[in-house]
């Protein structure tokens, strides 16, 4: 303020008598008041502090600029005192019933008043002032009807800066002001065009749209206020010039005043303008249509915004997934058993590069190569091996063990998958198919009632054909196409609608879709559209014959081991790898609270589907064993192998009615397993429980590499566990001590007390590697003394009464 040499007239706060609130300016509220000492009605704008507005007003003096009287400088009371415009703001006048009296002369007079006031600010004031917030609310009507420009709170001296902050109200703001770009005085020209549009249409600019929406429409879509088609041409041209996107093309206020004067001399313009003003009902629909279009555009924008947010969310998830994948080392090839030392070197490099302590682990890749670690050796490495190689950090050892375990798990899961790219030079794979005949019977149950309106019906689908055909049906879907009925999908028989449907509509049909399992090569599904008609007699069923071409699973692998997906795999190495994984899973699951799998009796079968499945797996020759332990290789050609295995695994082994005997119903089956147990169970127990020699255990003449490596890693049973689970027939006199040796189960260690007896049994191994076992039948007295309840408890596969 001192730079301009302005001296303010200071008015005491007590010298003012305040009345009602007249509205608000840019940075304060305006009140009507009486300047007591001067006996003058004034307007007082209360402020938190005196800023640039008083500085600007103090140097301005024009008929169309609000007159400045002085300031209030009594803390905390600060304010600006100006003349009072008794007729209110131009905005209030336009949006009231008084605006209906406006005519061509009225509009021209007021348009000229505003233009002259703005021309004074730009060209004739002591310092050029850019208002930047010109709008109908900041134009007031004095008592004599003259328009005066007020509220300079957003104004700037042009020689101070031309880069303005975001101020003003969006519908009146020029695009460069909205974007906070450097501005010139023509930004006020844009606002003047909006004020002139308000006087012509007596409408609120961009009514119903939010400020930011208007800003987006003006800047991004280059939208402007609608100029009605019946608007006089001279006014329309002036508005278009004021709203040019390029600020340099807009006219100055000197040019606008000249245009208004020429329009006043046009004798035809008054009639055109008055006709336009009085026929507002005809052209108002054009403005409303534009507003509706802009609102729809805004709604589409909101929808696109939500869509973009959803896409951004999905991209973030995808980015996170890629980040997680990037932390997984790249594999030289999926056939880990064929990895060379260089392949292992590459894998370790990828692994240590992803770790946090990559600098400390950078030399480990060379360490693996120096120790000649190939793919087969890599998957069998243990903690002691890593220490022997020179990896002493416990954290680094855990890091490598976790990576190797994950690599082993992934390899075993993918072992039986066929290659994506087949070798053209190799032998063609056997592709066996079998044909299953199936007849699908479609019909519906009908309760006739009195007619089609109150009858009840429901659709069904039956099957006839080969017994195994039902195992190839994945699901059956009934679609009635009724508005209040849902699509019914069933995965197991009986395939019939659960609820009755009341009434039969005209041309009522039901679309039945039968989907087959993945091992059905053709067809993948069968569709049938069944017509529902009302008839008191039994409706005729429709039969559709289907031939299913079944792709036989693992048939070529069982008949020809060389045709497996990985024929070059080392069976002994894979068996060792599988046994190691089973042992690691066993140690992890011993701490779980499952009463059966967590008990000391089942350390070996903790990761098996059922006891029977584990026994069958133990009896299967090595050449037919699959790596995945949850599939029974002896039934690999059966299409229902997974379903049966899953059903067996769901049995509760601890329940009374679902013991091991429930897994085999026929006596011949139990006898067959009894014969096998005599020949194989003792042999397996001896080889699995032989004491280890050295770190990896000693190799016996008849033991497999996998069993000799893990021979010393099974848990011994405590005496309390044996005493708890013994059958009552074991509680005999001390003379029967030699008959209290419990029946061994494959994979279970011998009791410490019976270890010496096991050694004796091992010493009696015959030439073929089988163990001689003498069985003694109970006397008639012992058998008769056994209760029926005890007989039931002891009658299950896996336990033998001595």
From Swiss-Prot:
PTMs per UniProt: Activated by phosphorylation by PKN1, followed by autophosphorylation on Thr-161 and Ser-165. Autophosphorylation in response to ribotoxic stress promotes dissociation from colliding ribosomes and activation.
Residues that bind ATP: 22-30, 45
Cofactor(s) required for function per UniProt: Mg(2+)
Sequence ranges of Basic and acidic residues compositional bias: 667-678, 728-741
UniProt EC number: 2.7.11.25
Residues the record lists as Phosphoserine modifications: 2-3, 7, 165, 275, 302, 567, 587, 593, 599, 634, 638, 649-650, 661, 685, 720, 727, 733
Residue ranges of the region described as C-terminal domain (CTD): 776-802
Residues modified as N-acetylserine: 2
MF annotations from Gene Ontology: ATP binding; JUN kinase kinase kinase activity; magnesium ion binding; MAP kinase kinase kinase activity; protein kinase activator activity; protein serine kinase activity; protein serine/threonine kinase activity; ribosome binding
Enzyme class, spelled out: transferase
Pfam family, one: PK_Tyr_Ser-Thr
Stretches for region Leucine-zipper: 287-308
PTM-bearing positions, type Phosphothreonine: 161, 586, 628, 744
UniProt feature, compositional bias: Polar residues: 624-642
Region (Disordered) location: 624-802
Subunit structure of this chain's protein: Homodimer. Interacts with ZNF33A. Component of a signaling complex containing at least AKAP13, PKN1, MAPK14, MAP3K20 and MAP2K3. Within this complex, AKAP13 interacts directly with PKN1, which in turn recruits MAPK14, MAP2K3 and MAP3K20. Interacts with EIF2AK4/GCN2; promoting EIF2AK4/GCN2 kinase activity.
Stated name of the protein: Mitogen-activated protein kinase kinase kinase 20
Species this protein is from: Mus musculus
Gene: Map3k20
């Amino acid at each position: 303020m001192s730079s301009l040499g302005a001296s303010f007239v200071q008015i005491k706060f007590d010298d003012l008598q305040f009345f009602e609130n007249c509205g608000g300016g840019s940075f304060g509220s305006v009140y009507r008041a009486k300047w007591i000492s001067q006996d003058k009605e004034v307007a007082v704008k209360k402020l938190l502090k005196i800023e640039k507005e008083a500085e600007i007003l103090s140097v301005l003096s024009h008929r169309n600029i609000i007159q400045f009287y002085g300031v209030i400088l009594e803390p905390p009371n600060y304010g600006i005192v100006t003349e009072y415009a008794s007729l209110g703001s131009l905005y209030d006048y336009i949006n009231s019933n008084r605006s209906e009296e406006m005519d061509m002369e009225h509009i021209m007079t007021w348009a000229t008043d505003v233009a002259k006031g703005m021309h004074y600010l730009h060209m004739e004031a002591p310092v050029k002032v850019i208002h930047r917030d010109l709008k109908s609310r900041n134009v007031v009507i004095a008592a004599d009807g003259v328009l005066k420009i007020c509220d300079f709170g957003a104004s700037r001296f042009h020689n101070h800066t031309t880069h303005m902050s975001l101020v003003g109200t969006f519908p009146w703001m020029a695009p460069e002001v909205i974007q906070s770009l450097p501005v010139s005085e023509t930004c006020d020209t844009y606002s003047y065009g909006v004020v002139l549009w308000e006087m012509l249409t007596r409408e609120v600019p961009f009514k119903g749209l939010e400020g930011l929406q208007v800003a987006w429409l003006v800047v991004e879509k280059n939208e402007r206020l609608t100029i009605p088609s019946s608007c006089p041409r001279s006014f329309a041209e002036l508005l278009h010039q004021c709203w040019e996107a390029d600020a340099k093309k807009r006219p100055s206020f000197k040019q606008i005043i000249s245009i208004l004067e020429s329009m006043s001399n046009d004798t035809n313009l008054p009639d055109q303008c008055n006709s336009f003003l009085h026929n507002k009902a005809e052209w108002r629909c054009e403005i409303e249509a534009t507003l509706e279009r802009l609102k729809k555009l805004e709604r589409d924008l909101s929808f696109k915004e939500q869509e973009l947010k959803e896409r951004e969310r999905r991209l973030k998830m995808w980015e996170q997934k890629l980040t997680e994948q990037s932390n997984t080392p790249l594999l030289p090839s999926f056939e880990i058993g064929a990895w060379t030392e260089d392949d292992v070197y590459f894998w370790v490099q990828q692994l240590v590069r992803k770790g946090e302590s990559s600098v400390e682990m950078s030399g480990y890749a060379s360490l693996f190569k120096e120790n000649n670690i190939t793919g087969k050796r890599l998957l069998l490495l243990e903690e002691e091996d890593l220490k022997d190689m020179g990896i002493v950090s416990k954290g680094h050892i855990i890091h490598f063990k976790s990576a190797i375990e994950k690599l082993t798990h992934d390899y075993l899961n993918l072992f039986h998958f066929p290659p994506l790219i087949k070798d053209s030079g190799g032998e063609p794979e056997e592709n066996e198919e079998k044909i299953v005949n199936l007849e699908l019977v479609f019909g519906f149950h009908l309760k006739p009632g009195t007619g089609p309106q109150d009858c009840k019906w429901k659709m069904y689908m039956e099957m006839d054909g080969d017994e195994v055909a039902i195992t190839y049906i994945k699901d059956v879907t009934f679609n009635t196409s009724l508005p209040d009925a849902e699509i019914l999908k069933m995965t197991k028989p009986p395939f019939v609608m659960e609820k009755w449907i009341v009434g039969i509509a005209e041309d009522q049909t039901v679309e039945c879709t039968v989907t087959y399992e993945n091992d059905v090569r053709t067809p993948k599904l069968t569709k049938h559209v069944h017509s529902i008609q009302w008839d008191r007699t039994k409706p005729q069923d429709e039969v559709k014959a289907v031939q299913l071409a079944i792709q036989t699973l693992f048939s070529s692998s069982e008949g020809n081991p060389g045709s497996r997906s990985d024929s070059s795999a080392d069976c002994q190495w894979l068996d060792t790898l599988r046994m190691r994984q089973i042992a690691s899973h066993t140690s992890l699951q011993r701490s779980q609270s499952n009463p059966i799998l967590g008990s000391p009796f089942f350390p070996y079968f903790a990761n098996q589907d059922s006891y029977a499945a584990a026994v069958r797996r133990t009896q299967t020759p090595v050449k037919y064993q699959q790596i995945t332990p949850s599939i029974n290789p002896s039934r690999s050609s059966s299409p229902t192998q997974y379903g049966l295995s899953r059903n067996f695994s769901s049995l509760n082994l601890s329940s009374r009615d679902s013991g091991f005997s429930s897994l085999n119903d026929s006596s011949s089956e139990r006898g067959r397993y009894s014969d096998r147990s005599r020949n194989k169970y003792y042999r397996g127990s001896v080889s699995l429980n032989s004491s280890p020699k050295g770190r990896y255990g000693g190799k016996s003449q008849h033991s497999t590499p996998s069993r000799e490596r893990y021979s010393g890693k099974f848990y011994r049973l405590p005496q309390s566990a044996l005493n708890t689970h013994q059958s009552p027939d074991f509680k005999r006199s001390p003379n029967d001590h030699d008959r209290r040796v419990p029946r061994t189960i494959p994979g279970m260690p011998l009791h410490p007390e019976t270890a010496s007896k096991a050694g004796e049994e091992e010493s009696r191994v015959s030439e073929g590697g089988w163990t001689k076992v003498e069985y003694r039948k109970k006397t008639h007295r012992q058998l008769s003394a056994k209760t029926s309840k005890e007989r039931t408890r002891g009658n299950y596969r896996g336990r033998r009464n001595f």
